[in-house]
Amino acid sequence: IEGAPTFPGLQDPCVTILDEKVILGGVRFPVTIGEDSKAWQMEFYREGLNGGFDKVLTGPPKMKDIRFLQLLDGRILVLTRPQGERGGRGRIGFCVVDSLIQARWETIENAPLFDHCPEEQWVGANEAHLLTKNKIGVLGHLAEFKEDGSRRYRSMVFCIDLETGQSTEPEVIAERPDFPSGAPKSPDWQDVIFSGGLLRLGRGQAR
């Protein structure tokens, strides 16, 4: 689209609406953090005037899959995905903040985590949907390394109960063979899907 804003260097885009404004997010790669010149970091841009977007938030270093969802009371659900000492290969956490200003690195990094998978696997949230006042549906991915060293990503869903802070177990809903064949970005990514754009149809149905 001629004249549309572009975001060079951003990967894995995501979108949500907060306070009636479009929020676009993505992973910037590479960025230099300390001595690591090939690190990554999420950035979020808010819809401004005349079709432009202004950067409003940068996520913690080396954390992907941060997602936001506005709740009925105006607060914001934050889905996190730390790795390393807290998260291993990748675990999903969540917290609720009053505004984006409160989504500080410390808050995001220390959000409580769900125990969704064994240590050799990892998970991440792709998008969140408000099901009822206190129930959140999450579309995400469950991933692992195969015996030949290549990656396997499957699409999964789970539900968060905001009252109890608990979640259901992830349920795999799709994998790569369910879709038409296509060229992967590299040979070790042939068995990978990264789902998004879920459209809710009502009566418990979606596509």
Range-by-range predicted roles:
Residues L10-P13, M63-I66, V123-A125, I193-S195:
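Conserved positions at the start
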